[in-house]
Amino acid sequence: MSKVTEITHPLILHKLAFIRDKNTGSKDFRELVSEVSMLMAYEVTRNLPMEEIEIETPVCKTKCKVLAGKKVAIVPILRAGLGMVDGMLQLIPAAKVGHIGLYRDEETLQPVEYFCKLPQDIAERDIIVVDPMLATGGSATDAITLLKKRGAKQIRLMCLISSPEGIEFVQKAHPDVDIYVACIDEKLNDHGYIVPGLGDAGDRLFGTK
């Protein structure tokens, strides 16, 4: 079974409180989501493979550790996942960015794919799938399935807030994918929204309804 890591750093929890607040406007919401994503990226990348190289300082030659040959790709689930990309690129500027477009059918609550654009070397990269909310788990599960069909092998999932149901759903479908969240909330309501959650992340990011 995959590992679930709840990243409860004080700065993350502080910013998450304002992300949840319904009175936080789109501008501040976007900035906070980006900041929390950057902070979470530190933990999500903790186990990236490393290798030793030799460099020369102004004093002498020495050996240092750097990221190994495999590189990172960030794959946001559109559209809300876009809000997490810039923050992550602050820490991983060389990462490539793919895009998977899924929307949730309001009646069935199931994800529907409408767009997919990935780096050509996706099979050679460590993949971090990002989406602010892990609610039913359907979108994340479908995105991961799509990535595996394209050859991706090393995949992590990073979300700001999740429901217990969403985590369980992803774990059953993809027991090899580790999940990183800032907070695991209480439950899903009858409309498939996380409680207490933060509302619709995409609408709050982009000022739409």
UniProtKB/Swiss-Prot annotation:
Species, as recorded: Clostridium perfringens (strain SM101 / Type A)
Pfam families for this protein: UPRTase (PF14681)
Major enzyme class: transferase
Recorded GO MF terms: GTP binding; magnesium ion binding; uracil phosphoribosyltransferase activity
Protein name: Uracil phosphoribosyltransferase
Regulation of catalytic or functional activity: Allosterically activated by GTP.
EC number(s) reported in the record: 2.4.2.9
Catalytic activity: UMP + diphosphate = 5-phospho-alpha-D-ribose 1-diphosphate + uracil
Gene (name only): upp
Binding site for 5-phospho-alpha-D-ribose 1-diphosphate: R79, R104, D131, P132, M133, L134, A135, T136, G137, G138, S139, D200
Cofactor note: Binds 1 Mg(2+) ion per subunit. The magnesium is bound as Mg-PRPP.
Function summary: Catalyzes the conversion of uracil and 5-phospho-alpha-D-ribose 1-diphosphate (PRPP) to UMP and diphosphate.
Keywords, alphabetical: Allosteric enzyme, Glycosyltransferase, GTP-binding, Magnesium, Nucleotide-binding, Transferase
Entry similarity comment: Belongs to the UPRTase family.
